[in-house]
């Protein structure tokens, strides 16, 4: 019982992050063209073939990370991959925010959830949200490392 109580914060953080990645990936499944349009809306210079590849693979990467987070499998590697994906998303949304691009981040389909959450789809809102999620990954890493030392 004591071991479960000690692990509860890590479990909660894994589930929260897992749900975020599940929602993001699920909303993009079968939406390759809208995802591709979102990638182009960031106005970054990448080859068309790479943009198309990202649009096709990204939902599956997000879903895989969700499953790994839920299951707690390959934990340090899953956290590193999650941090890398979030860092890339943060860099993209931050540059769009800095350049004052009036775009939807393409992270989720907030319209299906509630219009009040639309602010989280703006580049500024998405950047702040991603920084919060990155801090949760950092906290999860710290909890994992601390538990391994103890």
Name every feature range the model reports, one short phrase each.
Residues 1-30, 71-150:
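Extended, low-polarity transmembrane helix blocks
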Residues 24-58:
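Solvent-exposed, well-ordered loop and adjacent helix/strand elements within mature globular domains
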Residues 7-11, 37-40, 63:
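Short hydrophobic/aromatic-rich motifs at helix boundaries and adjacent loops
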Residues 53-77:
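Hydrophobic alpha-helical transmembrane segments
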Residues 43, 52, 62, 91-93, ...:
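Short, surface-exposed linear patches
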């Amino acid at each position: 019982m004591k071991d479960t109580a000690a692990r509860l914060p890590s479990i909660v953080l894994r589930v929260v992050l897992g749900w975020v990645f599940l929602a993001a990936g699920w909303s993009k499944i079968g939406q390759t063209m809208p995802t591709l349009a979102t990638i182009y809306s960031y106005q970054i210079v990448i080859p068309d073939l790479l943009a198309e590849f990202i649009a096709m693979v990204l939902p599956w990467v997000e879903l895989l990370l969700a499953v790994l987070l839920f299951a707690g499998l390959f934990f340090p590697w899953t956290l590193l991959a999650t941090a890398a994906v979030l860092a890339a998303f943060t860099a993209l949304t931050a540059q769009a925010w800095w350049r004052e691009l009036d775009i939807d981040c393409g992270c989720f389909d907030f319209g299906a959830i509630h219009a009040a959450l639309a602010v989280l789809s703006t580049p500024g809102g998405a950047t702040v949200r991603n920084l919060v999620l990155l801090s949760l990954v950092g906290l999860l890493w710290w909890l994992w490392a601390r538990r391994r030392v103890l």
